[in-house]
């Protein structure tokens, strides 16, 4: 069962996916907008195109005739996926899922209005005047997000009326779609955030990974740990919501479903129809299969009987602090001296401030507390420099 996989997006998540695919004898063509992207370094072939250009996407599909089209990022002309499905191509997890999750408006309305899931109160704004009206309804603080963005780009937390103009400007210049409509959300005073990795299968039941806790800065993942502290009642509710939304979107693969937890409530936040950055903690051997192996097996139709927690783990990101076209790596010798720890350097060809260049991992089978594992992962990340 050797499949030709066209990977659209070739970042660090794509790289680990390709490694998983190589281990099961699959053939991968890695695509991105720049050369020497991480996944290209381990794939069989590469293509460099602007994936927001539908005509270029069509050409790549016609050239390679892949068995599977696997999106890894949001910046893709996903509207073309419907046509590819009509032509007989398998889009992962489905054309519907890729299109709905590309746009926060589509997925939020689906979750809140159609599926009646609990979410933060929200409004949309297409002008600064509409943003002002939205803040008057939702109050301060509130959160502003472009409808199309990732890794916190263009997001702001508005604390007062004086910050509205700056937040509007950021939303219009840093999102994927440029000047466009935005979503404004009430700020939920949450106790924690979790990612519930959810696996939908062609040949098996829907499975849930042990919940992953995470911490963000600038709207982007900084740390994650597994398992996260969560009550049985909250876990069941999160699983119910994740099951409902993934069933509605259809398809097979792994989904990163994010939730806010308060003392007595679980709020649906966002969803990604692919491996999730916070799920890199599974590279620490926390599960019987890491998230990339799970994604691959699900899309290939290889049955996954169960997902088990093997040990506790934590991860922390290694960020660049400067812009450099010839980055240097240092500190690996120091970092390698820490027990029950590991690291991954992604191999991105260029650095810029806050760009994620690697991840550190810590783990324990001896009952070590999550707080201790988190500290070790963060300490490890501070020792490694990629600049």
Curated annotation (Swiss-Prot):
- List the keywords (alphabetical): ATP-binding, Ligase, Magnesium, Metal-binding, Nucleotide-binding, Purine biosynthesis
On the tree of life, the source organism's domain of life is Bacteria
Q: PROSITE patterns in the record, alphabetically?
A: ATP_GRASP (PS50975)
- SUPFAM superfamilies recorded for this chain? Glutathione synthetase ATP-binding domain-like, PreATP-grasp domain, Rudiment single hybrid motif
Please provide the Gene Ontology terms (biological process) for this protein.
'de novo' IMP biosynthetic process
State where Mg(2+) binds.
258, 270
Coiled-coil segments, which residues?
none
Span of domain ATP-grasp? 109-300
Q: In which pathway does it act?
A: Purine metabolism; IMP biosynthesis via de novo pathway; N(2)-formyl-N(1)-(5-phospho-D-ribosyl)glycinamide from N(1)-(5-phospho-D-ribosyl)glycinamide (formate route): step 1/1
What EC number(s) are associated with this protein in UniProt?
6.3.1.21
Enzyme category, top tier: ligase
One GO cellular component term noted in the UniProt record for this chain? cytosol
Q: Which residues bind ATP?
A: 104, 145, 150-155, 185-188, 193
Q: Which reaction does it catalyse?
A: N(1)-(5-phospho-beta-D-ribosyl)glycinamide + formate + ATP = N(2)-formyl-N(1)-(5-phospho-beta-D-ribosyl)glycinamide + ADP + phosphate + H(+)
Q: Which GO terms describe its molecular function?
A: ATP binding; magnesium ion binding; phosphoribosylglycinamide formyltransferase 2 activity; phosphoribosylglycinamide formyltransferase activity
Q: Which residues bind N(1)-(5-phospho-beta-D-ribosyl)glycinamide?
A: 12-13, 72, 277, 348, 355-356
HAMAP family the UniProt entry points to:
PurT (MF_01643)
* Family stated for the protein in its record: Belongs to the PurK/PurT family.
Summary of the function given for this chain in its UniProt record: Involved in the de novo purine biosynthesis. Catalyzes the transfer of formate to 5-phospho-ribosyl-glycinamide (GAR), producing 5-phospho-ribosyl-N-formylglycinamide (FGAR). Formate is provided by PurU via hydrolysis of 10-formyl-tetrahydrofolate.
Oligomeric form and interacting partners: Homodimer.
PANTHER family the record matches: FORMATE-DEPENDENT PHOSPHORIBOSYLGLYCINAMIDE FORMYLTRANSFERASE
Name by which UniProt lists this protein: Formate-dependent phosphoribosylglycinamide formyltransferase
| The species this protein was found in | Leptospira interrogans serogroup Icterohaemorrhagiae serovar Lai (strain 56601)
Taxonomic lineage is:
Bacteria, Pseudomonadati, Spirochaetota, Spirochaetia, Leptospirales
């Amino acid at each position: 069962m050797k499949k030709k996989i066209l990977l659209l997006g070739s970042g660090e998540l794509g790289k680990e996916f390709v490694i998983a695919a190589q281990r099961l004898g699959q053939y991968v063509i890695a695509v991105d907008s720049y050369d020497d992207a991480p996944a290209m370094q381990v794939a069989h072939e590469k293509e460099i195109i602007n994936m927001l250009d539908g005509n270029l996407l069509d050409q790549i599909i016609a050239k390679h005739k892949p068995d599977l089209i696997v999106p890894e990022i949001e910046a893709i002309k996903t509207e073309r996926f419907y046509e590819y499905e009509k032509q007989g191509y398998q889009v992962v997890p489905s054309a519907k899922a890729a299109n709905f999750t590309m746009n926060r408006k589509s997925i939020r309305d689906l979750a809140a209005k159609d599926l009646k899931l609990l979410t933060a109160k929200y409004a949309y704004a297409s002008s600064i005047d509409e943003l002002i009206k939205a803040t008057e309804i939702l109050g301060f603080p509130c959160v502003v997000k472009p409808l199309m963005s990732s890794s916190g780009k263009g997001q702001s937390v508005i604390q007062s009326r004086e910050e509205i103009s700056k937040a509007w400007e950021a939303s219009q210049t840093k999102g994927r779609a440029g000047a466009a409509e935005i979503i404004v959300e009430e700020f939920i005073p949450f106790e924690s955030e979790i990612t519930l990795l959810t696996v939908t299968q062609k040949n098996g039941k829907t499975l849930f990974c042990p919940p992953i806790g995470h911490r963000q800065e600038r709207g982007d993942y900084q740390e994650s740990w597994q398992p996260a502290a969560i009550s049985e009642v909250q876990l069941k509710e999160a699983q119910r919501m994740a099951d409902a939304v993934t069933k509605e979107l259809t398809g097979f693969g792994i989904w990163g479903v994010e939730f806010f937890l308060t003392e007595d409530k679980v709020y649906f936040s966002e969803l990604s129809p692919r491996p999730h950055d916070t799920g890199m903690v599974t590279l620490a051997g926390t599960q019987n299969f890491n998230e990339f192996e799970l994604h691959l097996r699900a899309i290939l139709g290889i049955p996954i009987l169960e997902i088990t927690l093997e040990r506790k783990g934590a991860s922390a990101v290694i960020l660049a602090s400067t812009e450099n076209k010839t980055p240097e790596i240092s500190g690996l010798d120091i970092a390698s001296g820490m027990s029950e720890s590991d690291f991954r350097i992604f191999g991105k060809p260029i650095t810029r401030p806050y760009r994620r260049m690697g991840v550190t991992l810590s783990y324990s089978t001896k009952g070590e507390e999550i707080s201790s594992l988190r500290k070790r992962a963060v300490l490890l990340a501070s020792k490694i420099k990629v600049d």
